[in-house]
Amino acid sequence: GGGARRWHGSCLRLPPPHRRRPHHTRCDSQVGSLADGGAGRSGARQRFELKEGGRGDGAAARDEITALTLGAGHAAAYRAACADLGWAPDEAGASAAEAQHVERLAALDAKHADAKENLGDVEIFDALLAKAQELAAEGAPRARVVEAFDEALAGTVATGHKLDICFQRMVLCLADHDLVGLKELLDNAQKLLDEGGDWERKNRLKVYQGVYFMAVRDFKRAAELLLSSVATFASSELFSYERFVFYTVVVASVALPRTELKAKVVDAPEILSAVGAVPHLESFLSAFHGCRYAEFMRAFSGIEEEV
């Protein structure tokens, strides 16, 4: 009903009407919190949550981000987080991490040279891909990371390898809040799959497409794609299955008619198996569908913090 509609924009942080961006543009939305796996920037999700959502206390968040960046030897990502969050960086630790990064790149270059000299195309591709992943995790400039992925891409004719690079670059786009780049990669991946791709990668693409449509506020298409992936979820580089169910339930609650919500979400075995693992989500869904609005509003306050 109309009352239920009023909370939708708040829950998913729609900007006010005069500031809404058209589809396919950059968007500093909750999309940034999704990218902390695969080829994403180290600590991207935690950094986003602390800056945009105000989640967690400062000391615990700093320790977590430092462990994910400096602790993993990724100095550029650490310095970027410090600059973004107003922290004074540990310069000695950052310098040591930077030296580790340089050593890793040198080792990967040596591995690539050895593969070219003594091994085959698969080993060459693996070395180039590993270097691109290292640059991405380090937080190297986007142009350098893309160039490294393109070099790996040029060394393979396998559709699966090309799709895997597309997915890893999509994670990078999510970390950088670049929805234009993400849309281009989604289109490229769809073309590759149309030419011939396996079911596992087709199912992974549906999740990425669902995330994109969620980010550009096309909640109906997002719900359709995410719901179609509930039984085949294979995109753990984006988020856990529980987090995937969380987004699916919230978006479906926004987009689906009540009868469809009951059939595809409220009574869905896969949803029921995971919904209890997410704080407030089970009571949010049950109360919303059952029109118990006092209970719903109590659950909603917890859900809003998680979105």
Predicted regions and their residues:
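Extended alpha-helical scaffold regions
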Residues: 1-307
